[in-house]
Amino acid sequence: MRVTVGQYSHRGQKPENQDFHGACLPQDHQLASKGVAVALADGISSSNVSREASQSAVAGFLQDYYCTPDAWSVKQSARRVILATNSWLHAQTRRSQYRFDRDRGYVCTFSAMVIKSATAYLFHVGDARIYRVHGDNLEQLTTDHRLWVSREESYLGRALGMGEQLEID
């Protein structure tokens, strides 16, 4: 398998870039047993600690995924790591000054892709997006987890660290 990875992030209109992204392309037996992993996270703009949440989520996923047993499937490995990361981020918020305001805590969106053999596995929480580029076509592969209050107002419905429970696409 040959994989080329390119990554770029821009802060947009925000004063600080709270995005974090990374990839792991193992060169040893883990390439066959675990595959190639790519992850990205975007902190919520209302929080001063979202950059830390994003960095922890991506770095933790890329490190911990490869520490899971080879007997576990890609889905089981990734889900367990993401759920553990969610628990850790939520606990960080509960122990911090932000414990009563989840919009200020350790919260971020998270999307990851693991490519193993000829299969791409997607794991997604929030409104960061994964697209497939094929020729001149751009196809969105993930669903935004936003709840719309009106045509102009919406809020994030799912994210890492937002609550004790987490539903992962």
Positions of PLM-derived features:
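PP2C/PPM-type serine/threonine phosphatase catalytic domain
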Residues: 1-169
